[in-house]
Amino acid sequence: MEPLSLTVYDRNIWHLFKKEEGAPQAMFPTNIKYIFEDDDDVADVDDLVFQQQQPDSELENVIIVEIDGAGQLENVELISDQYEMLSYRRERPVSLASQRSLSWLTSGNDTGGDAGKKSGDISDPAAGPDVPREAPLSIELELVSEFKDYRNLNLEDLKLDELTRIFCIQNKQLQMISDALN
């Protein structure tokens, strides 16, 4: 099974009003369980809960990622009461061999005893054997969480064009959710 990287972004406009460092809207799902089409050992959703969690705990959000036998992304589905999926996209980063080549180019010290070596040659002993491998499949999901009550915010401080932009973003999200339901 090829490694998988899953990143979830909450595109709720509420994050535009928060003044936090970093990216509070980015989430990295945990409690991941691989289920294969021919698995008979997963009887129900309760089997997906980590043993370290409380036995009576419930899963809140389930992301189903369908990948074919060749490792190609077929579909992503979200089951949640708190989030609606806006979109997903597959990202395949540069292969590991290419990453080594790029790092050799950027850190290149071409003036050593390797005068015959071309820039970007990855036969460098420190780089290890040049075995071309694919980088992990990377999937990014864009979700929107429940809309918040904005009455507590001081919206009078915002300019009209900023309020219009926020209104347009939220309308676009609502339209995407509506289209997905049809």
Swiss-Prot record:
- Name the Gene3D superfamilies on file: 2.60.270.60
Task: From the UniProt entry, list the residue stretches annotated as the region Disordered.
Answer: 105-134
Question: Is Hydrolase among the key words of this record?
Answer: no
What InterPro entries has UniProt attached to this entry? Atg31
Q: Does the keyword Repeat apply?
A: no
Subcellular location as annotated: Cytoplasm, Cytoskeleton; Preautophagosomal structure
What's the chief localization of this chain? cytoplasm
Q: Which GO terms describe its biological process?
A: autophagy of mitochondrion; chromosome segregation; karyogamy; piecemeal microautophagy of the nucleus; protein transport
Q: Which UniProt keywords apply?
A: Autophagy, Chromosome partition, Cytoplasm, Cytoskeleton, Karyogamy, Microtubule, Protein transport, Transport
Question: Which Cys pairs are S-S linked?
Answer: none
Any Gene Ontology CC annotation: microtubule
What task does this protein carry out?
Answer: Plays a role in starvation-induced autophagy. Involved in mitophagy. Functions with ATG17 and ATG29 at the preautophagosomal structure (PAS) in order to form normal autophagosomes under starvation conditions. May be involved in microtubule function, such as chromosome segregation and karyogamy.
Q: What is this protein called?
A: Autophagy-related protein 31
